[in-house]
Amino acid sequence: MDHFGENFALERLDALVGGWTMEAGPAGGAPWPGEAAVTFEWLRGRAFLIERWVVPAAFDGIAVIGAGEEPDRFRRHYFDGRGEQRIYEMTLRDGVWKQWRDAPDPFPQRFTAKFNDDGETISGGWEKAADGSTWEADIDVTYRKMS
């Protein structure tokens, strides 16, 4: 089965494919030390996009991104070196990348970032609702495409 043919929104993920450096840190604060590296690559068959990250100051991880239940949504299955597993809903359209999860374990999260005009930089951040309803800035993130 050619899943890519069934969900044309998957081609939007091509904007992420490749290697990126990533700066991240507490919202409004200095980035954590060390340069993080993130790669996105298609699993053969293009039904899933595989994301891998190495973050010297934190933890490494992987995510598997595929088609969501709605035509222009994706589902991101997240796994990290701490043993965390999370499932996020995700969109990527008009230069805006969003992810969110409403699960209370440990708290709801959402991410919004924008691509710059040439698609070489993505800037945004994560928010969390530690009490389940009040959103607060959590982590600032900037991705820069490697040449």
Regions of interest found by a model, annotated:
Residues M1-S147:
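Hydrophobic small-molecule pocket/channel-lining residues, especially in calycin-type beta-barrels
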